[in-house]
UniProtKB/Swiss-Prot annotation:
Family affiliation: Belongs to the UPF0231 family.
Name of protein: UPF0231 protein Shewmr7_3366
Entries under HAMAP family matching the protein: UPF0231
InterPro entries: UPF0231
Species classification: Bacteria, Pseudomonadati, Pseudomonadota, Gammaproteobacteria, Alteromonadales
Source domain of life: Bacteria
Amino acid sequence: MEYEFRRNSLTGTYLASFSMDHEVLGQWFSEELGPELAKIQQVLDIIKDIQAGKRDSWRLIGGDLTLDLDEEQARIYANALGFEQEYELEESMSLYDAESEAYCGLEDLEEALLSWYKFVEKGR
């Protein structure tokens, strides 16, 4: 999983871009976490708790995206995917694509979060 972080020098906006099949992580980092160091640290602390066996799983529901963590992986998905559909969507209208949902290993997410934390902290 590859990623790149940028900061718009005019607006001060922090942006994260992730490799194919993980694009939604970039949106989650940029929009749901943003430059809030306390929120980033909260997720890092939860990951440590899960790795230490203090928790089995954890969920953070954001404005547009949700993060689910368990002992093995992280899942980030659009909140719209969490609702059951009463009818079948046409294949071309499917919500399940790389821009709506992604999985990665817990350690991979932890590494990316640490990098994001350092990037944001450095830019202040």
